[in-house]
């Protein structure tokens, strides 16, 4: 876990479109690390899960009830989601379900 923990919270609404970004380290980039955000030979799906917490600054995940809100796999051209993540320099966009509460 990176220290210190962040102190900022971003409020989001059900139905909002969000983007997540993956990298090997906080300062790695595809220009400095050819395997960033992930080795291009690592093929597979991408999934996003959420869990309800009292605060987005919660530091433990013990006992949380996780649920999947996004999954991307292999497309009709045979390209895996991780390949699209690699080609998009570590970024993936997804939409929060409209049926959940607004949150952080």
Regions found by a protein language model. Give the residues of each.
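Structured recognition/catalytic domains enriched at protein termini
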Residues: 1-103
């Amino acid at each position: 876990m990176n220290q210190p923990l962040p102190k900022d919270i971003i409020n989001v609404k059900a139905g909002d479109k969000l983007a997540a970004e993956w990298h090997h380290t906080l300062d790695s980039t595809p220009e400095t690390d050819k395997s960033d955000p992930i080795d291009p030979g690592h093929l597979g799906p991408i999934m996003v899960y959420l869990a309800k917490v009292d605060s987005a600054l919660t530091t433990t995940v013990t006992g949380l009830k996780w649920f999947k809100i996004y999954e991307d796999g292999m497309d009709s051209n045979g390209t895996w989601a991780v390949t699209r993540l690699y080609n998009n320099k570590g970024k993936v966009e997804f939409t929060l379900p409209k049926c959940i509460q607004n949150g952080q």
